[in-house]
């Protein structure tokens, strides 16, 4: 899988994070990534979800919503993390969560007509209710494993997208376990 094709694909997926009113993920990424570091510590959902990524390049996607793409050049895995205001106006927390889940599924399908959902479930992670959507995609011949994780906390929505080559299901699963603290 070509790094440039994967990066182009991940940048196009940023539209998934446009779940709240005026929040858009117009990519404002600089052309230069940060240097590959030994570790990148990630803290999300008000500190309730923390994980460490090793050997990744970090690219800021949108400072308004805190979007960052972490790219592992060794495995060619991309992880996109975005936080922004939750779509909660006039709704209960449960209704807002359901609206966000439905919107995420719709946006995922709209981003690529070749996306195929393989499973979806709601799980508990560190006291957070988290929606998980797994699937596969074929984007211009690139066969990808996809996982979308979404949670809401303190009027913020957090979305994590994990994209890996279909040839690396073990690495894809390990990346998800790392993020979920399992």
Q: For the regions a protein language model found, what residue spans apply to each?
A:
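Bacterial N-terminal signal peptides that target proteins for export
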Residues: 1-13, 17, 21
């Amino acid at each position: 899988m070509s790094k440039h094709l994967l990066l182009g694909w991940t940048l196009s997926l940023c539209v998934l994070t446009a779940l709240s009113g005026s929040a858009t993920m117009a990519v404002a990424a600089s052309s230069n990534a940060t240097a590959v570091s030994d570790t990148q510590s990630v803290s999300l959902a008000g500190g309730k979800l923390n994980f460490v990524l090793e050997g990744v390049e970090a690219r800021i996607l949108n400072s308004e919503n805190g979007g960052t793409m972490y790219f592992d050049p060794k495995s060619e895995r991309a992880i996109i993390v975005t936080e922004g205001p939750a779509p909660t106006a006039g709704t209960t927390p449960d209704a807002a969560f359901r609206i966000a889940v439905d919107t995420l599924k719709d946006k995922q399908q709209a981003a690529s007509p070749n996306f195929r959902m393989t499973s979806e479930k709601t799980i508990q992670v560190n006291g957070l209710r988290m929606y998980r959507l797994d699937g596969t995609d074929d984007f211009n011949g690139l066969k990808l494993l996809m996982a979308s994780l979404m949670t809401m906390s303190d009027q913020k929505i957090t979305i994590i997208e994990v994209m890996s080559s279909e040839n690396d299901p073990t690495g894809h699963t390990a990346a998800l376990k790392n993020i979920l603290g399992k």
